[in-house]
Each structure stands twice: as structure tokens, then as C-alpha cells.
Amino acid sequence: MRHDLWIFPPNRDCNGGTAWWLDVDPEPVLIDCPPVTEATLVFLNRAAGDRTPKIVLTSREGHGRLGRLQEALRWPVLVQEQEAYLLPNLLLLDTFAEAFTTLSGLQLLWTPGPTPGSCVLLAPPPANVLFCGRLLTPLGPGCLGTIRQARTFHWFRQLASVSRLRDWIPPETSPELASGAALGALKGELLVPYSGWTPPPSLS
């Protein structure tokens, strides 16, 4: 879809969720777990080249068959510390608390609500994409927003996380939005413009 960005087919092991590959130097990132197929492994090995990418998990909803994927690739995994206990057998597992910056300058922010350890990843310009996991989900073509689902961990913390995220994003940037949820409601679109971020309901 872009020379630096790749999207994988929906992952049935993640309730139809979406994983992304962002090609940045010196450390590319795989965001959430794609379907673990031979085609996926061939692509990821070719895309990585002689680099060691990092696998970033935006929530427990994006784990899929992560153990099998890491066994094949031997890449380190980064997860918010609240959900590290769900991955006891991984060989290379790093955690963060409130925020984290990768070697490539990608910024992570803890955004609890959808799950206890939900987080987002901001790729600053020139990539200029916000990978928002399940915090923002498709509402319709060109539109992402926050919705309460049966699996939502804490609705009011989710609303607070969305408000905090708005303040955290640098005002001079308007990143495109990449959701980790199922994208069917976007009707063929993949990225959503920043203007398509629908405000959440009031906290009051």
C-alpha cells in the first residue's frame, strides 16, 4: 500500500484483527500478530533483511499465535507491562510502563481501556501514522472512533485514554490512522485521515 507500510490479511486468531509492518531504519516493527502462514514468514524475512525488527503488541487482542511466530523469526517482542504475564514462554520479551521510544524513534503510549495493557504507536514524519490498536475502531468509510464492546476492559478508562492521546499527539502533526481491529466497516479503505477521528462520548 506504501513503500514503507504493509497490511496483512485479517487474523482469525485475533477476532479478525489487523496487523501492520512498518519499514523504518534501523529497527522495523511488526505491529500485532498476523496470520502465521508460510507466505507471512517469507515476506517478513525478506522485508527484514539483515535487520532485527521488533514485534509490538498493542493489546492482548493482538497476540494470535505469537509463540509460533517468534519461534520462527526469533524477533524480540515489546508489550505494555500489564499484559506481559500472558506471554510466559516467549524467549525475548521486553516491557514498558507509561511510554517508550524505539531505536527508530517510534513512540508508544499506554492507553488502557480496551484491555489493561492497550497501547498505541506513533510513527512521526515522514511515516506519520498512528497505529491505534483496538482503541479506535472503524465506524464507517473514512471514520474511526471509540466504541464500547463486550470485551472492553474499562470503558471510562478507555475514554480517558482517548482524551490523553489527543493531547499527546504533537499539534503540528496530523497522522493517518491505522486500526488494529477488523477493517470491514471501512469498505476497502485501509488508512483513515486524522480528520476521520470521531470524538468519543462525553465522560460526564
Where are these regions (language model features)?
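Short secondary-structure boundary/capping segments
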Residues: N11-R12, W20-W21, A99-F100, L122, ...
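Active-site HxH/HxHxD metal-binding segment of metal-dependent hydrolases
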Residues: P34-G105, G196, P200
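Metallo-beta-lactamase
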Residues: P28-V36, Q107-W110, T115-S204
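Flexible, charged surface loops at secondary-structure boundaries
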Residues: M1-R2, L22-D25, N45-R51, E71, ...
